[in-house]
Curated annotation (Swiss-Prot):
Keywords: Chloroplast, Plastid, Ribonucleoprotein, Ribosomal protein, RNA-binding, rRNA-binding. Belongs to the universal ribosomal protein uS7 family. It comes from Lemna minor. CDD domains: uS7_Chloroplast. Part of the 30S ribosomal subunit. One of its GO terms (biological process) is translation. One of its GO terms (cellular component) is chloroplast. Pfam families: Ribosomal_S7 (PF00177). It comes from the Eukaryota. This is Small ribosomal subunit protein uS7cz/uS7cy.
Length: 155
C-alpha cells in the first residue's frame, strides 16, 4: 500500500482583466519563451478585434468557438500483437478544451495575415460560425474515430 497521498488537481486561474479561465488557458498556450506579457497583449488585441468584427460579447464568441472545436472522441495508437491500431477513446472536458485551444492556435498560426492577434481573432470568429481549419481538424478526428470503431474493444 502506497504511503504517498494523491496529487491535487491544479485548477486554471483566471486572467486579470476578464476574470475568465479560458482566456488564461489561451494565454498559457500561446506563450513562447516565457514572454507572458506579450501573450496577454496578443490575446487582448484579438479580443478587441472580435468585438469590432462581431459587435457582440467577445467572450461568448470565444466560448462558442472553443465549444465548437472541442472533440468528443479521438484516436490513440495501441500496439496489439505486433500491429498498431488506432483505438477510439472518449475525451474528458478538460482534455477536450486543451486540444481545442491547441488546434485553434495551430490553425491561426497557419493563416496568412498581418499579426497573430489578427489571425487569432479571424480563426475564433470562423470557429464560432462553424467553419475554419480548427473545425475541419475536429471533423477529421471524429471521422478517424468512426472509421476505427472496430478496434474500440482494445481499450
Amino acid at each position: 500500500m502506497s504511503r504517498r497521498g494523491t496529487a491535487e488537481k491544479k485548477t486554471a486561474k483566471s486572467d486579470p482583466i476578464y476574470r475568465n479561465r479560458l482566456v488564461n488557458m489561451l494565454v498559457n498556450r500561446i506563450l513562447k519563451h516565457g514572454k507572458k506579457s506579450l501573450a496577454y497583449q496578443i490575446i487582448y488585441r484579438a479580443v478587441k478585434k472580435i468585438q469590432q468584427k462581431t459587435e457582440t460579447n467577445p467572450l461568448s464568441v470565444l466560448r462558442q468557438a472553443i465549444r465548437g472545436v472541442t472533440p468528443d472522441i479521438a484516436v490513440k495508437s495501441r500496439r496489439v500483437g505486433g500491429s498498431t491500431h488506432q483505438v477510439p477513446i472518449e475525451i474528458g472536458s478538460t482534455q477536450g478544451k486543451a486540444l481545442a485551444i491547441r488546434w485553434l492556435l495551430a490553425a491561426s498560426r497557419k493563416r496568412p495575415g498581418r499579426n497573430m492577434a489578427f489571425k487569432l481573432s479571424s480563426e475564433l470568429v470562423d470557429a464560432a460560425k462553424g467553419s475554419g481549419d480548427a473545425i475541419r481538424k475536429k471533423e477529421e478526428t471524429h471521422k478517424m474515430a468512426e472509421a476505427n470503431r472496430a478496434f474500440a474493444h482494445f481499450r
